[in-house]
A protein has these predicted regions:
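Multi-pass membrane glycosyltransferase architecture that uses lipid-linked
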Residues: 1-227, 232-234, 253-386
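Short aromatic-rich membrane-water interface segments that cap or initiate transmembrane helices
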Residues: 240-252
Length: 386
């Protein structure tokens, strides 16, 4: 005898709640343990802002680079920095509350998307678990204190609204770009999907970015220097295969290779938008970025994860390849940490092998996407289906 659909739905909801409860409990345990160098930047930037200092024009004593983003996440941190200063509760704990919220929002939107796309309770629970309980996601957010999932959640929600032809999609996409830079990489696909609403999308996106940046428009040159120039002049680093060139040629030639690859990436992002469904396009564009970026930090590997989960169930022909790539992203992001292995920050075998895997999976995505488009194409006039 089959299980009634209502009972099955309640059981699936209970399992999803359990996944969320376990994930939140693990995060609560990880949050107070430590914080990474990036989190020091959030701490110093929010402290300086509460003191009335323009952090773009007058940098606090950052341990590394500047706060290289538009100020949306900074605004989210301000009330928690104020609470830390007035209650004695550690900012390591309070400052990670928006990060925790980003993780939970990602899980909830991903679960809703899986439910809508598959109608499969098992897919909803398992897919949400793959993201929310992923060790790299846990390390990057709750442990280290990076806020990538805030931007990922906003982008996921914007795409969900865009597919439903909601005018508010532009608002949420603008917030995603204002949180972190990477959502702007998929702009060609967003524009393609927004047929009939492109002018509204442009107005909304521009308006959001102007409103978020308004307090710093008087120092816009300094802000753009921190956001754009700081990354543009970097040498290859971390998990990028371009680190293999360092020491074998001049740093100027290495940077030139990076600029050429950036140009190729921008061209590729436009061409992919003409050929792929939006979900596959976002995933393919982010994977292409992993190949072309001259700096590849483990946090970048979190960006494509929700779309890997979606493609896992919506593209069954390439399920094995998607599972393999998802596993590789997770393992590489964790193992390439010099604190847990002896090969340093950019181990040659890992960075070269991962680049090859990215290229292979990118080809798989494009080929499968084109095959699916061909299968869905209407028959020529007069042709009969076999």
């Amino acid at each position: 005898m089959g299980v009634p659909s209502g009972t099955a739905g309640q059981a699936a909801s209970a399992r999803l709640v359990l996944v969320l409860a376990v994930g939140i409990a693990v995060r609560v345990a990880l949050i107070p343990i430590t914080r990474g160098q990036d989190f020091e930047v959030w701490d110093l930037a929010s402290t300086a802002t509460l003191q009335g200092i323009d952090i773009y024009a007058h940098h606090p004593a950052y341990p590394g680079g500047p706060y290289a983003y538009l100020p949306l996440f900074l605004y989210l941190e301000l009330p928690f920095q104020w609470l830390a200063e007035h209650t004695g509760i550690s900012f390591t704990v309070l400052g990670k509350v928006p990060v925790l919220a980003g993780d939970i929002a990602c899980a909830l939107v991903l679960a809703a998307e899986l439910r809508d796309r598959t109608g499969n309770n098992r897919a909803v629970v398992l897919g949400t678990s793959l993201f929310f309980l992923n060790p790299l996601v846990l390390y990057n957010g709750a442990f280290y204190g990076r806020f990538d999932t805030v931007a990922v959640a906003l982008l996921l929600f914007a795409v969900r609204l865009l597919r439903r032809r909601k005018r508010s999609a532009g608002l949420w996409y603008g917030l995603a770009v204002a949180a972190k830079t990477f959502p702007v990489f998929v702009l060609p696909g967003i524009v393609r999907e927004a047929r009939g609403r492109r002018i509204w999308l442009a107005i909304t996106l521009t308006g959001v970015l102007l409103v978020v940046s308004a307090p710093y428009l008087s120092s816009w040159r300094a802000m753009m220097s921190d956001i754009v120039v700081y990354d543009a002049v970097k040498a290859p680093g971390a998990l990028s295969w371009q680190t293999l060139f360092i020491g074998s040629t001049s740093i100027e030639k290495v940077r030139l290779v990076g600029y050429v690859l950036l140009a190729l990436y921008l061209i590729g992002a436009v061409l992919l938008a003409r050929a792929l469904d939006l979900d596959v396009y976002i995933l393919a564009t982010l994977v292409l970025f992993l190949v072309c970026s001259k700096v590849l930090l483990e946090q970048y590997l979190v960006w494509p994860m929700p779309w890997l989960v979606l493609v896992l169930w919506t593209a069954p022909r390439i399920r094995a390849a998607t599972i393999a790539f998802f596993g590789a992203v997770t393992v590489v992001g964790m193992v390439a940490n010099p604190h847990i292995q002896p090969w340093g920050r950019s181990p040659a075998l890992i960075v070269a092998g991962f680049a090859v895997l990215c290229v292979i999976y990118l080809v798989v995505l494009v080929v499968d996407g084109r095959r699916r488009d061909s299968a869905l194409a209407p028959e020529p006039n007069g042709a009969q289906a076999k």
